[in-house]
């Protein structure tokens, strides 16, 4: 499929056009028509009904939903993607409420600041959806994408969306969406690209505290940061004056290795080695909440169960339904930029960290190898990292 850039899609939306938004192939893997309520024209919903044929919904911010008393459709939401449907509505000025014109009227009234809860009949023929406050950075769904796109065009936080179906009633995917795009001359973007766009556009960390931290390996300055969209807490250890070409270690949290000195992995040994190096040569350790390469502590323990049955660290993740590595280094890049650092010497054996930082504008001037001894317990793990994951060990 050929995707357009986010800026061109925003321009199209602001001109009243409809675009196609495609989600992750591991999620619904479908395309929705998306329009911004404030900019859409009288033909938008008619086009969706005739050409896309899916359910026409109206994503809105939580503020709009609360102001208009749009309560959840059900108390116990069992939708597999957690889509926040409210009770369906028609505006009181409609008749049956089902015509494209009347659904357009209802959608427009959702963003009218003079509208009140009593102005909408329930149930109706338009289905509001409530977006997460943090948008696609909290949930990578079409609901959040529509509201984020509206905000990025400068409009009120509301949109209209509709799934695209093929002529035979199946959901349009892949080349079907490409043909639909070409037939109707529409812009097409991915939610993943929208996520990256927002990450580059908006600050994602907040500085919270700085203290002196004496350790077994020397005394460091410890900075505390909070990720604004996930509420994750990140700590950074520094030694010496902060400068360009700083020696930097990105360390993914490993409770079992860092705290309990597990020999299943080499994480604890790498952290200690890096602290000794930074204490001697100066630099920075960014300690990231990425337990189990991003799958979390309990899932990592589940992966260990599979490893005890003969899986390796990669195939265990895949068997649990995860990619081999879910980590993203945007937060790390944001922290480096907070310190005005764009060029670093990276303490790492993992090539994916190099690429992960480069895509966010960080230049890797030099790689510093982290050498730790192998144990009888982590031999297979180390071999898998080297052979399957390309680690330089």
Curated annotation (Swiss-Prot):
Mg(2+) 2 binds at residues 28, 142. It catalyses: D-ribulose 5-phosphate = (2S)-2-hydroxy-3-oxobutyl phosphate + formate + H(+); GTP + 4 H2O = 2,5-diamino-6-hydroxy-4-(5-phosphoribosylamino)-pyrimidine + formate + 2 phosphate + 3 H(+). InterPro entries: DHBP_synth_RibB-like_a/b_dom, DHBP_synthase_RibB, GTP_cyclohydro_II, RibA, RibA-like_sf, Riboflavin_synth_RibBA. Mg(2+) 1 binds at residue 28. Pfam families: DHBP_synthase (PF00926), GTP_cyclohydro2 (PF00925). Pathway: Cofactor biosynthesis; riboflavin biosynthesis; 2-hydroxy-3-oxobutyl phosphate from D-ribulose 5-phosphate: step 1/1; Cofactor biosynthesis; riboflavin biosynthesis; 5-amino-6-(D-ribitylamino)uracil from GTP: step 1/4. The record marks 125, 163 as: Essential for DHBP synthase activity. Its EC number is 4.1.99.12, 3.5.4.25. Keywords: GTP-binding, Hydrolase, Lyase, Magnesium, Manganese, Metal-binding, Multifunctional enzyme, Nucleotide-binding, Riboflavin biosynthesis, Zinc. PANTHER family: 3,4-DIHYDROXY-2-BUTANONE 4-PHOSPHATE SYNTHASE, GTP CYCLOHYDROLASE II-RELATED. This is Riboflavin biosynthesis protein RibBA. It comes from Staphylococcus aureus (strain MRSA252). The gene is ribBA.
